[in-house]
């Protein structure tokens, strides 16, 4: 110990103290830089989140609008309802002129209707046209006199499957005839509606035209 140079020992202590001081200073500087970086990240987070939100997919499920739609004009355009355009046929029933003497017409009191007739170019095969549906009319007594009449009337309309036959049961012993009429309707794409008087037959047309 007596041979140790005190100057050298003191210089070592001074060097150690200096290293400790530099180390502590470096830690302080590092913590400050970390705090600065953290504050910068906190300031940048809202901007980043806003960018993410603005890039979200807009669809019918989240019901969100882009930011450029926030002005009043764009919002009005977005909320404006489109005008409704009905594609349904008109409510006026078209009646073939061959039905002029049909008592059914006297009972069509709550439905608008007008006569139409066939021309050389435009042939009319229906008795009544209701909402785009072709309707044929037949009575049991007439069918017994002219059995082939209804099948000939159905033939040009059979390519469509939305046809209707209004059949008035105005005679007794109709079971066999009804079976035949039902088969004709099934094989020619007709819906069979049975009525027992002209007033009831007219009600069918009024209901179909609602």
UniProtKB/Swiss-Prot annotation:
GO CC annotation: endonuclease complex; nucleotide-excision repair factor 1 complex; nucleus
Keywords on record: DNA damage, DNA repair, DNA-binding, Endonuclease, Hydrolase, Nuclease, Nucleus
Molecular function GO labels: damaged DNA binding; endonuclease activity; single-stranded DNA binding
Disulfide bonds listed in the record: none
Listed GO biological process terms: DNA amplification; double-strand break repair via single-strand annealing, removal of nonhomologous ends; meiotic mismatch repair; mitotic recombination; nucleotide-excision repair; nucleotide-excision repair, DNA damage recognition; removal of nonhomologous ends
DNA-binding region: 133-153
Ranges spanned by the short sequence motif Nuclear localization signal, renumbered to the chain: 17-23
Compositional bias annotation for Basic and acidic residues: 65-80
Compartment(s): Nucleus
Polar residues bias spans: 26-64
Family annotation (Gene3D superfamilies): 3.40.50.10130
Keyword Nucleus: yes
Family: Belongs to the ERCC1/RAD10/SWI10 family.
PANTHER family documented for this protein: DNA EXCISION REPAIR PROTEIN ERCC-1, EXCISION REPAIR CROSS-COMPLEMENTING 1 ERCC1
Protein name (Swiss-Prot/TrEMBL): DNA repair protein RAD10
Organism: Saccharomyces cerevisiae (strain ATCC 204508 / S288c) (Baker's yeast)
């Amino acid at each position: 110990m007596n041979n140790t140079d005190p100057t050298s020992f003191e210089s070592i202590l001074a060097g150690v103290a200096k290293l400790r001081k530099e180390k502590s200073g470096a830690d302080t500087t590092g913590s400050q830089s970390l705090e600065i970086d953290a504050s910068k990240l906190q300031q940048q987070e809202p901007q980043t989140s806003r960018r993410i939100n603005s890039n979200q997919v807009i669809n019918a499920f989240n019901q969100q609008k882009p930011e450029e739609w926030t002005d009043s004009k764009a919002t009005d355009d977005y909320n404006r309802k489109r005008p409704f355009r009905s594609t349904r046929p008109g409510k006026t029933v078209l009646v073939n002129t061959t039905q002029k003497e049909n008592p059914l017409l006297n009972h069509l009191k709550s439905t608008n209707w007008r006569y139409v007739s066939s021309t050389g170019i435009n042939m009319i095969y229906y008795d009544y046209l209701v909402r785009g549906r072709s309707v044929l009319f037949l009575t049991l007594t007439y069918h017994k006199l002219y059995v082939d009449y209804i099948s000939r009337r159905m033939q040009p309309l059979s390519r469509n499957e939305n046809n209707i036959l209004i059949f008035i049961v105005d005679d007794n012993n109709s079971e066999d005839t009804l079976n035949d009429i039902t088969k004709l309707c099934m094989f020619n794409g007709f819906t069979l509606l049975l009525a027992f008087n002209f007033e009831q037959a007219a009600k069918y047309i009024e209901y179909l035209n609602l």
